[in-house]
Structure formats: C-alpha cells, structure tokens
Amino acid sequence: MAKKTTKRMPKRREEYTYHGYNIEQLKAMSMDELLAIMPSGARRKVLRGFTRDEEDVRAKIAEGDGVRTHSRSMIILPEMVGKNVAIYSGKEFINVEIPVEGVFHYFGEFALTRKKVTHGSAGIGATKSSKYVPLK
C-alpha cells in the first residue's frame, strides 16, 4: 500500500489586532478614541503631554524614515508603525523598524541597554586542575 503524502501549507499568520482593531483602524482613530483603549501607563503619559524632544521625534517620524533619537520613553503610536527609527541604547544607535505588535509600548523596549553575557572557557590557574596544563 503506497503512502499518501499531502503537502503541508505554511502556517498563515493572522492579522494583528489590538482589542479587536487592526492597524488601519487604529491609524484612523482620533487621539480620544485611542486613549479609551490604551493601557493605563501609556494613557497617563499621553495625558501628561509629550516632552519637546518627543514632539520633535513625532514630527520627524511623520515627515519620513530614518530618525535618530535618545527618547527611549516615547510611546509608540499607530502612526509610527513600519517606520525606521534609530534608538540610542546608551552606547550606540540601534536601528529598529517599528513592528505592529509594538503599538503602545516604549521605544526603549526595542533597544536593549545590556548584552547577554557569554562566558568563555576558564583561564590557566582558574581552577586547581588547570595549573598543570602545559602552555602551548
């Protein structure tokens, strides 16, 4: 009996929605409508008002791509999705294309300030047994 093979279709990714709204609907909403569905931390930050630096970043992102910023505390709004932003990590600027899933998160969440530590092998004299290893 011959084995029947079926070709598996690649898993289709569903369209991202935030509280039932897709990204086009979020972009079309007014700020008051967005405030109603924002998480409380982002809502309080928006209600307090953006700083001058954050307003400048927002204006530059609206003009076009390729913005460099130190404002890690800027809230990602729906109008920023898909834009390229260089976010300062404390050492260098990290280029980030803002994903759809990043709406209402902070810029700083996408530019990490610490690297993951990768430990190497122990050096000579680090352990008692390694003292007698011949040097090359």
Swiss-Prot record:
Keywords: Ribonucleoprotein, Ribosomal protein, RNA-binding, rRNA-binding. It comes from the Archaea. SUPFAM superfamilies: Ribosomal protein S19. The keyword RNA-binding applies. GO terms for biological process: ribosomal small subunit assembly; translation. Gene3D superfamilies: 30s Ribosomal Protein S19, Chain A (3.30.860.10). GO terms for molecular function: rRNA binding; structural constituent of ribosome. GO terms for cellular component: cytosolic small ribosomal subunit. The keyword rRNA-binding applies. HAMAP family: Ribosomal_uS19. PANTHER family: RIBOSOMAL PROTEIN S19P FAMILY MEMBER (PTHR11880), SMALL RIBOSOMAL SUBUNIT PROTEIN US19 (PTHR11880:SF2). Protein S19 forms a complex with S13 that binds strongly to the 16S ribosomal RNA. Belongs to the universal ribosomal protein uS19 family. This is Small ribosomal subunit protein uS19. It comes from Methanocorpusculum labreanum (strain ATCC 43576 / DSM 4855 / Z). The lineage of its organism: Archaea, Methanobacteriati, Methanobacteriota, Stenosarchaea group, Methanomicrobia. The gene is rps19.
